[in-house]
Amino acid sequence: MKIVIAGAGEVGTHLAKLLSKEGLDIILIDNDENKLHAIDANYNLMTMTGSPTAFKVLKNAKVDKCDLFIAVTPFETRNIVSCSFAKKLGARKTVARIDNYEFLKPEYQQYFAEMGVDDLIYPENFASLEIRTALQHSWARNFTMAS
């Protein structure tokens, strides 16, 4: 499976590390060459310096052949636009990190689908799910009650 990840921040780097350990074909795109060099030296993945909203960068990353394009830069609009471009170039599935919870409303899903964004990630949802799951375990309840 070929996966292209746009954004070498905490989320993108974590995803790239995890997925590369699974033996998947990973390309990580970011503007910061120093970040990419540090990651490239330690993990089995390919890195590419550039903007995920530049057609040249997306074409060089061969998004037309990727099974999954994940945009997790710190900028919501960049994530949406890069997913839209990747989808138009042939990416099979696209996922964009967002900061606006309103975008998750069912009535807006069609808009994103029409733009080429298949799924949205709202990081705060993951945090709340993890907290809820932790509180269901006795060790977490005991820890929070003791504090």
Question: What feature does the model see in each segment?
Answer:
Residues 1-147:
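Cytosolic regulatory regions of ion transport systems
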